[in-house]
Amino acid sequence: MPKLSETYSKWKSIGEGLLAIVLGLLLIRFGQVIPRMGYQLLMGYFSLSAVWHLLTRWFQDKKRRENIFVTLGKLVVAALVFDSIILQDLALYLLVFIIASYQLFTGIISLVTWSLYRKNAIHPRLHHLFDAVWMIGFGLYSISPFHDAANFELLLLGFYLLMLGASSLRDGFFFERIENNPKLKRRMRMTLPIFVTALIPISTLRKLNEWLSNHESQEGEVHSERKNDQTVDLEIFVHTSETSFFLAMGHVDICYQGTVISYGSYDPRSERLFGMVGDGVLFKANREKYIELCKRESQKTLFAYGLSLTEQQKAAIQARLAEIEDLLIPWEPSSQLMKRREGEVKHTYSYQLKEEADATLYKFSSSEFKTYFVLSTNCVLLADSIVGKAGTDILSPQGFIVPGTYQDYLDLEYTKPNGLVVSRSIY
């Protein structure tokens, strides 16, 4: 008999998928009518809410009772703006502006990625330039005040919601299916926008902290859970911390056969573009010492996801690790004291890794990982290039994955009875 949490996750995926598909079809068919109707429904909700507060105020405790003039003010404002064409147009333009801004954002990411690939003579790279041109073109066209691009952008949004809904429906309908993927082929998955999934690691941490504050006597139960008795062959760590914005977005690395493999911009002397670009550095470290360093140095919380692999998947991952090994050049971090981002003068983080976590560090002789870029050739892409050999889903056709996107996928896999993820731990 399936667990309640599994049943909930299954029907949640189906419900979200159906909702996204229906909304997508409505946007494709009716265009601007849908957001305008949504605006009116929102104003109608505010009006009814104000009326309800007005009718029930005499039954409420005086301390919780809203000031009658505030309630009347809400009612009057909602009634006045309910059918305001100007405000409807403003809300519609704001929606289009957000979509166009996201297109410009992803277009710039593609352009920077293409530029780095070109500098490092990486092929293929033309698709990144193509993505940059059409995404920036769409964004500039839609954000221009000289014409109305609302229907065009809503059409694109509708098709995006159809694909997003299809991914959710597939998750729901095949939730309990035992995967049979002998060729370890990867399936395409449509995910939420980067600016949404970027908040998942810190959001998960805050939920954990809230849970712990209410269950102090059972704190140990949160730190480790297993779905079944299958062995854990590979771990994926998702880090997050509330100490800075970049740490809040998270970091991803993997642990295979007791060794942590991580990738990032660990050479501060090579950093540029506000620290977003730098030489790509890979390190291998002792698992236990690395976890302790992360908790001590940056006050990080690590969410560890354990994957159970078949012999075929292990062989594919080991082959990929061997490919990466051929690209590595040993690198020694400087022992010189430097001013860190936190403002402290101390050894670089890469030097601490070497001294405190028994890490060996490397740079890349070639490949897309020669230069690190926080929004494309980042820690998640390196981890995914390894774990993906086990047949996990492709989370971005463009290769832009943030830690939150990966964590969302791993959490979903854990809820599936036959999913790849068999354990979750928190450090």
Task: Cite the ranges covered by each PLM segment.
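Conserved, well-structured beta-alpha core segment at the onset of a catalytic domain
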Residues: L94, T106, T113, R125-L129, ...
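Membrane-interface segments at or immediately adjacent to transmembrane helices
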Residues: N181-F246, G250-V252
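Membrane-anchoring hydrophobic segments
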Residues: M1-D83
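Glycine-rich catalytic cores of cysteine/serine-nucleophile enzymes that process amide/ester linkages
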Residues: D229-D326
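Membrane-proximal helix-loop-helix units in multi-pass membrane proteins
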Residues: F82-L126
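Activation targets extended, charge/polar-rich intrinsically disordered C-terminal tails
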Residues: G17, R36-Y39, M43-V51, T56, ...
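Juxtamembrane "helix-exit" motif on the non-cytosolic side of transmembrane helices
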Residues: L26-V33, W58-F59, F82-L90, W114-Y117, ...
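Helix-boundary/low-complexity linker signature
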Residues: G15, G24, V33-R36, M43, ...
